Amino acid sequence: MVRVGAHTSIAGGVYNAVEEQVEYSGNCGQIFSHSPQVWQDPNIDDDEAEQFRDLAADHGVGPWVIHSSYLVNLCTPKDDLREKSLDSMQKEVDAAAKLGIEYVNVHLGAHTGAGVDGGLDNAASVLDDLDIPEGVTVLVESDAGSGTKLGGQFEHLATVRERTDQDIEFCLDTAHMFAAGYDLSTPEAVDETLAEFDEVVGVEDLACVHLNDSKHECGTNKDEHAHIGEGHIGEDGMRAFVNHDAIRDVPLVLETPTENGKSFAWNIERVKELRGE
């Protein structure tokens, strides 16, 4: 059975994310622990955390991912931003442990002039300074690769893993990969792209996929998500991707838009159809 779910809201209490996931017929999921647009601490009390853990277990929904703040920049050469990013990430991994959540997902961020090599060194350094609780793993996510943002090349992911002492794993975002120039629009392209990822990084360290179609063509570095099968990756590419041997057992988390009358529930059902379930 495919593990597929959506990014759900914690409004009114973190446990509501589980109830929302069940409404969508999702069986795994992702949350923000707080508003991702500001520097803010997760505000989750013990009772809320227990309710979340109990509901997730009762409904069989998991694994879960906490997506880090959009402000976090692991690659930054600026000391103040580095410290804010480190503090934010530490609070995210601690919140994950409290909630019984397995993964914390993070973008590498932008080197903003430090250069690719310097930026990757900076990212590894921040990861090294984290005190990651047992049972929690940091996932580094692939990026669309615009500007000085790193993570758009598989080699960036592999290099950070080589340079950090932490046991990190990875999240591939299909829209980001496509935007960064990794074609996924045909079965042949999916085979080629995933073979390259396996060679450079290794599919055994792929813990999660953000499954999104793309509103823009391959290689544009433009990150705008589309409904599954309705963007430039398209139905053939999405079907090949979700049925690929490297992906079949990996949890799929949707970050698709809610527009044109199509919700997360529609996209989850679409994935199940593409999987023949």
Swiss-Prot record:
Pfam families (alphabetical): AP_endonuc_2
Keywords: DNA damage, DNA repair, Endonuclease, Hydrolase, Metal-binding, Nuclease, Zinc
GO molecular function: deoxyribonuclease IV (phage-T4-induced) activity; DNA binding; DNA-(apurinic or apyrimidinic site) endonuclease activity; phosphoric diester hydrolase activity; zinc ion binding
Catalytic EC class: hydrolase
GO biological process, one term: base-excision repair
Cofactor: Zn(2+)
Amino-acid positions noted as binding Zn(2+) 2 in the UniProt annotation, renumbered to this chain: E141, D173, H210, E255
Positions annotated to bind Zn(2+) 3: H176, D223, H225
Identification of the protein by name: Probable endonuclease 4
Organism name: Haloarcula marismortui (strain ATCC 43049 / DSM 3752 / JCM 8966 / VKM B-1809)
Gene it is expressed from: nfo
